[in-house]
Regions:
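Conserved small/polar residues in nucleotide/adenosyl-binding loops
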Residues: 156-157
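ATP-dependent carboxylate-amine ligase catalytic core
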Residues: 2-16, 20, 26-112, 120-147
Length: 158
């Protein structure tokens, strides 16, 4: 498989804005003329329709609970083969799955060897985000956190 820009959008919790951020990034890449291949962790069928509306191509579910890791890897390789960038939207909290992190977004990122961009809901926090993010960055050395997007930041004006 050729090397393309690829990443997984994850968050510490559900409701952090993964879908909004994912769709926004997909739209930005499309506007730049890139062919974007969208993916969604888990069995979700609603978010995949949002992805398809933005990207004009099927969004593929990567579900390590319902399918083998080999099948998930094969789907990812096949559908991203002709893309310029692959964007995988996570589900729930990054490590939330069954039996700890089995079936989680973290498992998919590790399996595919792709970096993670965390979406952190900063609506009711400021400096307290630092230890939270430090925990995510250092919790599993086999999962690379490549960046953080702060969502719902408060704007202070003087």
């Amino acid at each position: 498989m050729r090397s393309i820009p690829q990443f997984l959008i994850a968050a510490p919790t559900s409701g952090s804005g993964k879908t909004t951020v994912s769709r926004g990034l997909m739209a930005l890449f499309m506007k730049k003329g890139l062919k974007v291949q969208p993916f969604k962790c888990g069995p979700d069928y609603i978010d995949t329709k949002y992805h398809e509306a933005v990207c004009g191509r099927p969004s593929v579910n990567l579900d390590t609970f319902m399918a083998s890791q080999e099948h998930v890897s094969s789907l990812y390789a096949r559908y991203s083969a002709d893309a310029d960038v692959a964007v995988v939207e996570g589900m729930m909290g990054m490590y939330d799955g069954y039996d700890r992190d089995r079936g989680s977004s973290a498992e998919v990122a590790r399996l595919l060897g792709i970096p993670v961009v965390l979406v952190a809901d900063a609506k009711s926090a400021a400096y307290s985000m630092a230890p939270l993010l430090s925990g995510f960055i250092n919790f599993r050395p086999d999962i690379r956190i490549a960046g953080v997007i702060f969502n719902r930041c408060l704007l202070y004006t003087s």
